[in-house]
Swiss-Prot record:
One of its GO terms (biological process) is nitrogen fixation. It comes from Nostoc sp. (strain PCC 7120 / SAG 25.82 / UTEX 2576). This is Probable cytochrome P450 110. Keywords: Heme, Iron, Metal-binding, Monooxygenase, Nitrogen fixation, Oxidoreductase. Belongs to the cytochrome P450 family. InterPro entries: Cyt_P450, Cyt_P450_CS, Cyt_P450_E_grp-I, Cyt_P450_sf, Cytochrome_P450_monoxygenase. It is an enzyme of class 1 (oxidoreductase). Gene3D superfamilies: Cytochrome P450. Probably involved in alkane/fatty acid hydroxylase. The keyword Metal-binding applies. Its cofactor is heme. Heme binds at C393.
Amino acid sequence: MLTQLPNPISVPSWWQLINWIADPIGFQKKYSKKYGNIFSMQLAGIGSFVILGEPQALQEIFTQDSRFDVGRGNTLAEPLIGRTSLMLMDGDRHRRERKLLMPPFHGERLQAYAQQICLITNQIASEWQIGQPFVARSAMQKLSLEVIIQIVFGLADGERYQQIKPLFTDWLNMTDSPLRSSMLFLKSLQKDWGTWTPWGQMKHKQRSIYDLLQAEIEEKRTKENEQRGDVLSLMMAARDENGQAMTDEELKDELLTILFAGHETTATTIAWAFYQILKNVNVQEKLQQELDRLGANPNPMEIAQLPYLTAVSQETLRMYPVLPTLFPRITKSSINIAGYQLEPDTTLMASIYLIHYREDLYPNPQQFRPERFIERQYSPSEYIPFGGGSRRCLGYALALLEIKLVIATVLSNYQLALAEDKPVNVQRRGFTLAPDGGVRVIMTGKKSLKFEQSSKIFN
């Protein structure tokens, strides 16, 4: 480890940790102003990290992925997602697992999932009442969880379907504030002394989720001859070059990773999108006009190709990164990054926030302006909502598809407005960042249903 990392923050490590947990965006704003876009923080009890907000540094990292370990940099997430999650793997093991997991999230499978997303969106939105305010993020959490349960697990009814929804929601809500999130960062709070302690409650709920996942895996094995298109069935059928399937432990950890990563992030992004769309009349009108030109019952994949809808989704992901940084990368040997000579075992974290708010890349970065993504293309080191290199989010295509289709379906069929005329701040929620208060909206009217897909795609 270097005795002197680039531009170290000169305050006690315990104070850095408190501020990082409480407000990671404010933390980066403050210290980037003082030290520039490359600086080092030391979090008491966790370690030292070099924060990178320079596209050139990211390009150097993404093009030299083999010189870094990412799995061993994600140990903070292990208690949540299990030790055999793809996020905790490196080298050949990571390549094997990623290859096994890739097919369900790309290609023709997306077309089948698209129709189901539109259907689920209308089912959830039909519960909203005219004139009755609701929290957009909570509604999108419910919607996103339904998408994952139906598309990933292939469940649409039954006892297991009813059990997993409230259980998983309760599990995630245990870290719904900076204070409650602190147990993810402080080992001293990770004591399983039964359900009367927060960590004990979290682990108890996690074990219950694992039991439900195991039961679903075993039931699917009894129906291996059935042709099913859900993600879990495709994962179970996948084989590596040696003919080996994923173990039950790997399957459960990957399912929990998908639930954890896909549910939280997508719901939060859609809530932010509605906040900005409803706040900016010009954006809403332009988007509505684009959607209206499609006519009745458009093909979902046609919707996903709409340029302004795509730009709105991209701008939302730029302004509101769900994670404050990309996952840590640990140097395997001495390496030069952005002019800094770094020793082996130096931990680097690319700052999504610092990259996405650079004035030279995104003029007036505080302004919600989707047109910037129509006017120019950004390189993989200039726009990083889903990461980069060999560690780019595996499910990014499905996530982006869901974001677009939910926005389009809701705006085409329902009239919404913000319930409160006040700014919405960013708040830590576990490892992620979410709108404080969740974005309160109100339905002011309904339109004749434009997207009326009504058939389930999984048997």
